[in-house]
């Protein structure tokens, strides 16, 4: 999309959770993107690049009365949030004054509290039919070393808050997500609109667009379920050839060109649908058919003896590496007195319409010349 519109595409690593992200995780993403044939150039970013600004933006929201520190337990917050049919209820900490909220948030940053003691929540609408707008948490305490920032931080922003602001700071125009984030878009817009109104973010603001996730027949695509396979030792790892990951497909023999062709053929849609696995396989077949050099193998060999050919004779014959691309050259196929053919390609007695080698007809091995048949091949093999 970026190339078609003379734009640029950013690669951003969402490293807001130090428990889950590490250098290996990041390197595997970059390696997969490079393997597909894409280069982000100077546009590599990390959510952690913006930790200082994200923290200051959160302080602004507190000062504006749009955020508060909630000391409720996770179970209490879950009960107060309500359901799809019942509105949420206010936490008893929702009306803390600005000074207390700022002080608690500062002390959270300085490491005074254990994990889970407090969270910073936005003050939006507890009666909203969209549960994502019922005072979502945007900061949590995590006393864990971050692979890029070390121990500088023990409070970390959550994805929805970080995602929208990072897009705005990078001057993104189109932020593309899968359909599961469609209900998160109002929160995405709410955050950056409030900060833009305060002059902290520049307009025009980015827009989030959603598309359907890929569903392949006979294929488990859920990251959670694939993680269970990896952690349970049912597969060798994420690059197991049975896994539908990029590294798994690579080990299975798929090429980056075939995967890009697959993406072009199925297109982008907002409707959930299932793509037959054969479409992916056809893309690999079509891509390899264009450039793969040909080779011949005999799987069920039957010895063929040319009885009037010198026992020590060798004659060079040649086969094209690709029948449609002569520029790929030829490969030698030495002709000897003894050859091997597929057992199914011989039939001692056959009907008139049979095109196999037989005792009553001449035969011509591929890329050689006609060989008259004067007897049945030996049973060796």
Regions found by a protein language model. Name each.
Residues 1-7:
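Histidine-anchored nucleotide/phosphate-binding helix
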Residues 12-20, 42-52, 75, 214-215, ...:
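Conserved short loop/turn motifs at secondary-structure junctions
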């Amino acid at each position: 999309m970026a190339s078609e519109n003379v734009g640029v595409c950013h690669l951003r690593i969402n490293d807001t959770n130090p428990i889950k992200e590490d250098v290996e995780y990041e390197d595997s993403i970059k390696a997969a993107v490079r393997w597909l044939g894409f280069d982000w150039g100077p546009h590599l970013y990390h959510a952690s690049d913006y930790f200082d600004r994200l923290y200051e933006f959160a302080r602004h929201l507190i000062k504006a009365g749009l955020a508060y520190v909630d000391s409720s337990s996770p179970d209490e917050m879950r009960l107060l949030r309500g359901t799809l049919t019942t509105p949420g209820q206010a936490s008893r900490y929702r009306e803390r004054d600005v000074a207390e909220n700022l002080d608690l948030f500062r002390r959270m940053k300085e490491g005074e509290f254990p994990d889970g003691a407090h969270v910073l929540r936005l003050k939006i609408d507890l009666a909203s039919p969209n549960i994502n707008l019922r005072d979502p948490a945007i900061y949590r305490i995590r006393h864990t070393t971050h692979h890029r920032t070390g121990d500088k931080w023990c409070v970390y922003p959550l994805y929805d808050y970080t995602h929208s602001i990072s897009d705005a700071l990078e001057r993104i125009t189109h932020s593309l997500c899968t359909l599961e984030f469609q209900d998160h878009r109002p929160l995405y817009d709410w955050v950056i609109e409030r900060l833009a109104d305060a002059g902290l973010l520049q307009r025009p603001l980015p827009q989030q667009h959603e598309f359907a996730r890929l569903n392949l027949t006979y294929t488990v695509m859920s990251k959670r379920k694939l993680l269970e396979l990896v952690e349970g030792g049912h597969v060798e790892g994420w690059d197991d050839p049975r896994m539908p990951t990029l590294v798994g497909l690579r080990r299975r023999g798929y090429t980056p060109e075939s995967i890009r062709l697959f993406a072009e053929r199925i297109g982008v849609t907002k409707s959930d649908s299932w793509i037959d696995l054969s479409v992916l396989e056809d893309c690999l077949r079509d891509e390899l058919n264009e450039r793969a050099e040909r080779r011949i193998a005999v799987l069920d060999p039957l010895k063929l003896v040319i009885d009037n050919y010198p026992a020590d004779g060798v004659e060079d014959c040649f086969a094209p590496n690709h029948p449609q691309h002569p520029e790929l050259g030829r490969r030698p196929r030495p002709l000897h007195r003894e050859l091997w053919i597929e057992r199914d390609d011989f039939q001692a007695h056959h009907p008139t319409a049979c095109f196999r080698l037989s005792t009553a007809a001449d035969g011509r091995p591929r890329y050689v010349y006609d060989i008259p048949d004067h007897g049945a091949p030996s049973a060796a093999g």
